[in-house]
Amino acid sequence: MSISNISIKAVLTMLLTCGLAVAQSPSLLKPEEKAASSPATNLPSEATVNSFMQQTFGYEAQVTWKISSIKPAPVPGLAQVDVILAGPQGQQLSRFYVTSDGDHAVIGEIIPFGAHPFAAVQKKLANGAAGPSRGPKDSPVLIVEFGDLQCPACKAAQPAIEALVAAEPTVRFVFQNFPLEMHNWAAKGAAYADCVGLASNEAFWKFVSKTYDAQSDITAANADEKLTALADGAGVKGADIAACAATPVTKGHVDASIAFGKAVGVTGTPTLFINGRSIGNISQVPAETLKSLVDFAAKQGK
């Protein structure tokens, strides 16, 4: 849909949630992002985007923004614009698309289309999802969550995800780290989680649950202390986990998980994939709908 002053006001509330977050830096355009344009794509200038934002949000004194990136969209003929919005509800990176003539902006997801729209992503996930897992590896249903331990929406979604996995013991469930750069201890949390997972698959799930429970008490300043204690509480040696989390190797693991998420189209946390089908705002999806999606995927996978 095209953006209007009325619709974008409504969309602002939706955008300022973790569910539509994009793992991008709050900095202005990076050189590699500027170089990503191709002759076939007409990219709007920073000045034009800023003017658009001013005309759209200027009446909202509490809303500020910063351009994160302007680059070609995954499909021809559209430019993808990522802008960090900040308001009373917090800070979040939102995305919209601009048509090649520069006359229209579009809010919404670009989703796969075709006779088998989820097959390509399903194959990538089956081959590349390497995080801690539960359930049989030969299951016809693969559920992959991309999560951020500092994201409140991820915490809110956990009961629904845990209930789904508990009710469907024959599915395979994999967790992939996807810390958002706008969260100041998320990357560290992901590093600790990675190390806990390597030490003990059982301890990993306890660590994730405990970290979500303690989420509001963790800050950038006390993250090492809190996460070390949580690792101890999960049944592994916290000091060893802290040492592991600080290594370049672990950073590489986390960076690889983020890159993998981007490669399968993750634009926010939590994102759940059920046999390649992407589901956001998980806590808002009724349990019976999630079960129906799993049952349908199981039938399709046979």
Predicted features and spans:
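C-terminal cap of thioredoxin/glutaredoxin-like
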Residues: I3, Q24-E46, N50-I107, T228-K302
